[in-house]
Amino acid sequence: MENLGKTALVTGASRGIGRAIALMLASRGYAVALNYAGSREAAEAVKTEIENAGGKAFTIQGDVSVSEDVDRIFKTIKTEFGGLDVLVNNAGINRDALLIRMKEENWDAVIATDLKSVFLTTKAAAAMMMRKKNGAIVNISSVVGLTGNIGQANYACLLYT
């Protein structure tokens, strides 16, 4: 395996695209830190799948839109693996509603999870990666950033960057 000894963090790794990315990275030799916000059971299932295939993974709960959680996540990665080689910013939520009916707290939740989290995790990862002068950061987006969907103004505005 070409990436033995390298570590990747995947946010939102307990299901969907994040799960698929985590499995792919593990199959290529990365030790994978599986971040999840709510479903420990789903994250543990991904960890088990990776380990059953001979890979290395650990789960770490945290809301990546909260700086204290991000600090804890990165301290844990440094302790467990010594550093980080790849960050995949995949965590995301939606709170669909027509703009004129959207509650401000739903707007704010999407902005925090889908945008602020990228700032916080990228800042922490870049600090680790700059020390070793190597690393990769991948931000997952959506076609909704190009075409938009009814009821997803908050989600779509984050993706066209």
Question: Residue locations for each model-derived region?
Answer:
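Conserved glycine-rich cofactor-binding loop
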Residues: T7, S14-G16
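Substrate-binding pocket helix/loop in short-chain dehydrogenase/reductase
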Residues: L98-L99, N106-I111
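The beta1-alpha1 cofactor-binding region of Rossmann-like NAD(H)/NADP(H)-dependent oxidoreductases
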Residues: R40, Q61-I73, E104
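Residue(s) in the substrate-gating loop at a strand-loop-helix junction
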Residues: S142
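Conserved glycine-rich Rossmann-like NAD(P)H-binding loop of the short-chain dehydrogenase/reductase
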Residues: R28-A45
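A short, exposed helix-loop element centered on a Lys and neighboring polar residues
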Residues: T122-K123
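Conserved small/polar residues in nucleotide/adenosyl-binding loops
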Residues: Y160-T161
